[in-house]
Every structure is written in C-alpha cells, then in structure tokens.
Amino acid sequence: MADYNTLYHQGLYLSPDQQDLLLAALSSNQPPQKQQNDKQRSQAKTDPDSTPGNMSSGSFSMSPGFNKTHPGSGGLGYGDDESPFLDFNPELDFDFPGSENLIGDLPGSLPSEEHEVGEKRKDMSDNENEESGKKRRESDDKAAKKPGRKPLTSEPTSKRKAQNRAAQRAFRERKEKHLKDLETKVDELQKASDDANQENGLLRAQVERLQVELREYRKRLSWLTTGSGISAMSAIPSAHSRNLYGLNNNDFMFDFPKFGDLPGGHIFNGPLTKSNQNKPRDGSSPATSDSQVPGVMTRETLNGSNNRGMPTAKAANGVSNNPSPKVPSVYNIRQSASSHDSSNSCSPSSSSDSHQSQMLSSNGTSPEPSSNSPATKLNDSVQNHHACTYSTIDGEASFCAQLGMACGNINNPIPAVRGKSESVSNTPSQPNNNYEQTPGPGLDLLAQQNGGQFDPVLFGDWREPQDAILSQDFGTFFDDAFPLPDLGSPSHNFNEVANPQPPKKDLIAEIDNKLDEEVVPGEDKSQMLSCTKIWDRLQSMEKFRNGEIDVDNLCSELRTKARCSEGGVVVNQKDVEDIMGRVK
C-alpha cells in the first residue's frame, strides 16, 4: 500500500512538456509574456531535477527521490537505467475518471497541437499588425514634422464651409455690382451719343439754312454790284475811269458808313459840312450857304473852278440874283445845273460831269431827280440833232447814258424818252429866277429839314418796284415776312431748308409782263447784251473807227429795242445784230 501511494504521488507531477502546454494555455491572453515563457522553458530543459512546487518563481522544487547526489534514489529520467522501477510500464495511463478535479479547475480544456499552431500563427500576425501600426504612426509623425505651414486641423469643417460660402457670396455680389455699374455707364454713354447726334443734326440743318440765306444775300448783292460793272468802292467823285459807263442804270447804291457816323458824311466832307451848316444863313449870300447842301450838287462843287472853259455865268447869275427863300433857291440851283448839263451833253467833259453828279447824288442817297428825269432833260429835243463824238474815253459813258434813257430810275420811274414831250409842255424850257414860276421843291424840302443828312438805314428793307426783281426772286418777300419756325419746333422740316419750294406764279406779274414788253424775262438773260458788250461790238467795226456811222441814229434804234433789268439797260442779241447789220 505504501508503494502504491509513493507511485501515486510520483504520478501526480507533470512532465516538462505538459508544464509547457499548461503555461501556454494559461498565458494565451498575455502575448508580451511569451519571452518569459520561452526563458522558463529553456530553464526547465536545462534543469530537469526541478520540482513543480515553485512554478510561480520560475524554478521547480525537487522531491527527495530526485536528488542527484543519490543516483539510485528513483528519480525520473528518460533512460531506462535511471528509472528506479525496472518493471514500470511507460504506456501506463494515469488519467482516470475524476483526475482533472484533483488539482482544481482549469481555465479551459487543453488545446490540441493543431490549435496550438493556429494560435502561434495568430500571435505572429498580431505582432506584425502591431509592428505595422507602430510604423504607420511613426511615418505620420515624420510627415507632420516637415517644414512649412501646417493645415489647421483644429477648426471644424463646418466653420470652413461657412467661410467658403460667405466668400463666394461676397464675390458674386461684387461681380453683380460691377456688371450693374457697367450697364449704367453704357446707358449713359448711349444717351450722350444720341444727344450729340441730335444736336449735330440740328446744327447741320442750321448751317444749311445759313448757307441758303448767305447765297440769297450774295445774289442780292450781285444785283447791286455786278451786272452794270460798278462796285461800291469805285463810286467816288474822283473815279474818272471806264467804270462810269453805266451811271444811268438807276442803281440805288451807297457806301457803308463808319460806326457812329451818318451815311454820306465822308463823301461830302462831313466836318466841313457840319461847320458850314452851323453858320448863320442870310438872304444876301444864298449861293454860298445853300450850295453846301449835300443833296444838291452843282458844277462848282464838282470841279471847283471853271478850268474846262464852260459857260456857267447864266447859272451863277440865276443863283446870286435871287433873294428868294432858301428852299426855292436851292431848287433853282439844282434845276439850272441840271439844265446846263443837259444842254452840253454832247461834249465828253460835260457828259462825264453830269454822270459824276448823278453818281454822287445817288451815293449820297439824296432823293433828287437824276439826269434821266424830265426836269433835267428840258432841251434834249433841241440837242438831239447835234453830232457827238465818241472817240474819247468817256464815249462809252455817253453812249450808255443815251441808251439808258429808255428806262426810268428810282425817283422817276417813267422813262425819259416817253415823258420827254410831257416834260417839255409842263416844265418851262428856261429856268427863271422867280419862285412862282418854278414847281414845288419836292423831296428836297424833306432833305433840308433833316439838316441835309439822309439816313438810308431807315429804309434798309425797302425794295425797288421793278417787275424784273419780283419775277426772278418773288419768294424772298414771303421768306422775310413769314420766317421759318425754330429748329427745335416739331413743325420744322429740314427738307424745306435744303430744297426750297419754287414760288407760285403771280398772275398780276404775268399780266404786267404781257402789257409792258420792256421788262426782261428771266429766262432770256443769256440772250441779252448789256451796254458794254454793245459798245465793244461798235469799237470792233471799222466804219465806227472811221467815223462813218451815225451813232445818234444807232442809239435811238437800239433804244427802241432796249429792255430794262436790274443790272441796267439790255438789248436782245438778235435785235443788235439786225441793227448793226443794216449799218454795215
């Protein structure tokens, strides 16, 4: 029985392999202690005499039977010679029912060898995962340690999104505001461009209208200066030239006065005239006082002296011996001077002086009758049979003067040729010194009441009553009376300015043209020859140069065919060729 107990107690101890399996099962949940287990296992292999009494301390207490000092003490060994029991069956199974309860409850059934291999593989994979996780953390730490600005990971993502949305919204608002500003600026520029275009159109229309008016005024000025060849600057007392040929064309001309001066004062020596007018006039010397009236021109005022050897004693006696009042004496002076000029019209000097007198009186805007009036042509019927020479430089002026008798002038619209017989019967042939035998003073009284000065500005809008002007430019009267509306008004039409409407036909003017054939039609101006052209044709004729042509008869024939125009007396080219053909 004692032997059995000893065997039983010896069988309760575990072999080293069993101890290793037990430790592995117990330490399966503690991987870091594997090295310690391996160390303990190695110690257990090197020390087989250790007992399992002190497992927790890493060494086993040996029983007295396993003492190495007693080789025959019956210690357990791998060799058969070391076993104390020679007849011991090694295949003896010590496991009996209920033997697992002898040493206490185990944490779990012992795993098999296959399960142990799986656990080892699992432990190896876990170790590898732990090592890879450490490497990853180490790599993250290395990446975070790079130089430069690190992203702010502390702020939440929602806050960053809100800031991004606010920035985008502000950008869109600025963009929309910029677009609105650009659209507003474009609208303003478009409006300014439209206004500028409209203003340019109005200014362009106004310029066209002014150009039309300028052409109209130039046309009127050409009627006064051209046509007869006389300019406003050449109409002065000392103008002894060929420009004096058309003095009987009845043009109403005056030079433009200086600012602040009355018209005509520079022609008649205004300061001297004013000083002479301020002197007291008495009845003893009416010739010296009344001869200074600007509207009355005598031979003494033109020539200053009788250097031409003309008989002027009769006119001088008629003036000096008359103690009548001033107005009749002035009229007698003018009448005697004009009759003296008409009686000596055959000589070139007298004809030129008479034309100078007419020119000065018209330039001074005095309303006295010209040399074509009946009062100055008292002795024309007596003097017409005298032969006149046209070889001097004033021959053209004399020829044009006789040819101009076919037309009237401003003061005497009746032509001198038609009113010759009437003027001879109603006007005395010789001037008398008595005031009762002379006609009324006429318009000279008005001129003298104004101090001898006549202001043509008062009659600036006056027009000559000639049918030729009315027939050619009849619409200008209505343009002045009813001017065009303002350019800004809606009733204004720009086409009316650019293309003026032709004037309507005047029935009264057509009737007058039918009755009076002495008016030049506007469409036949190219076929009309002026006095200058007729005189040039006469000079080109050899018989005229030799003196074989009767100029008086030729002038009378041309006068019967003459027509009146705004530029003077004109004759149809066909009539001139017929008359000159008969003379040849």
Curated annotation (Swiss-Prot):
Region (Transcription activation 2): 377-480
Matches recorded under InterPro entries: AP-1-like (IPR050936), bZIP (IPR004827), bZIP_sf (IPR046347), TF_PAP1 (IPR013910), Yap1_redox_dom_sf (IPR023167)
Span(s) of short sequence motif Bipartite nuclear localization signal: 35-42, 68-75
Alphabetically ordered keywords of this record: Cytoplasm, Disulfide bond, DNA-binding, Nucleus, Transcription, Transcription regulation
PROSITE patterns: BZIP (PS50217), BZIP_BASIC (PS00036)
Gene3D superfamilies, per the entry: 1.20.5.170, YAP1 redox domain. Chain B
Protein name, entry field: AP-1-like transcription factor yap1
Protein source organism: Aspergillus flavus (strain ATCC 200026 / FGSC A1120 / IAM 13836 / NRRL 3357 / JCM 12722 / SRRC 167)
Gene: yap1
